[in-house]
C-alpha cells in the first residue's frame, strides 16, 4: 500500500504543480554558441519544452523524433529542448556542447539551463520531462517520461 501511495504522489505532484501557472518568461538561457536568449522570445504561441540529458538513453532515443517535429512548420506551438549542464548528473557545458555538436540533428533548438532555474521552477524530477507553456509562457502542464510526436501534439492541444 505504501508503495502505491508513493508512486501515486510522485505521478500526481508534477501535475498539480503545473496548475499554479508559474511564469518562465523571465528566464534567460544559453545557446550552444554561448549566446544568451530569453524565453520571452517565444511569447505569442504555446511552447513545448523537452527536458533531457545526454546520459539518458530514453531521451537520446527520442531525439530523432524531436528533430522531425521541430522541422514541422505547420505546428501551432513552438518546440525547444533544454539540457541542464552541471545539474542532475549532466556533464558541464563545454563537454555537453562538444558532445552534442558531434550529433547530426538539423532542426532541434537546444538551450542550456546552466543554473537549473527551470528544473527548480517546473519541479523537474527526472528525464525525459515534458513541459507545456501557454502563449504568455506560464507553465500549464508537465508530464514525466517519453512522448512520441503524436503524443506531443496531443499534449500541446489539451
Please identify what each model-predicted range represents:
Residues 51-65:
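Conserved redox-active cysteine motifs that mediate thiol-disulfide chemistry
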Residues 4-13:
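Sec-dependent N-terminal signal peptides
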Residues 45-47, 52-55, 126:
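Short pre-active-site segment immediately N-terminal to redox-active cysteine/selenocysteine motifs
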Residues 16-39:
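N-terminal "domain-start" segment that seeds a small globular fold
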Residues 102-106, 113-155:
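Thiol/disulfide oxidoreductase modules built on the thioredoxin-like
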Amino acid at each position: 500500500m505504501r508503495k502505491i501511495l508513493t508512486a501515486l504522489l510522485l505521478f500526481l505532484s508534477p501535475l498539480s504543480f503545473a496548475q499554479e501557472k508559474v511564469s518562465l518568461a523571465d528566464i534567460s538561457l544559453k545557446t550552444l554558441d554561448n549566446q544568451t536568449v530569453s524565453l520571452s522570445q517565444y511569447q505569442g504561441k504555446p511552447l513545448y519544452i523537452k527536458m533531457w540529458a545526454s546520459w539518458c538513453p530514453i531521451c537520446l532515443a527520442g531525439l530523432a523524433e524531436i528533430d522531425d517535429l521541430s522541422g514541422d512548420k505547420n505546428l501551432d506551438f513552438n518546440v525547444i529542448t533544454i539540457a541542464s549542464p552541471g545539474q542532475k548528473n549532466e556533464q558541464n557545458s563545454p563537454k555537453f556542447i562538444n558532445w552534442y555538436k558531434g550529433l547530426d540533428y538539423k532542426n532541434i533548438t537546444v538551450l542550456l539551463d546552466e543554473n537549473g532555474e527551470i528544473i527548480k521552477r517546473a519541479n523537474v524530477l527526472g528525464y525525459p520531462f515534458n513541459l507545456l507553456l501557454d502563449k504568455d509562457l506560464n507553465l500549464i502542464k508537465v508530464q514525466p517520461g517519453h512522448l512520441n510526436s503524436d503524443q506531443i501534439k496531443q499534449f500541446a492541444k489539451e
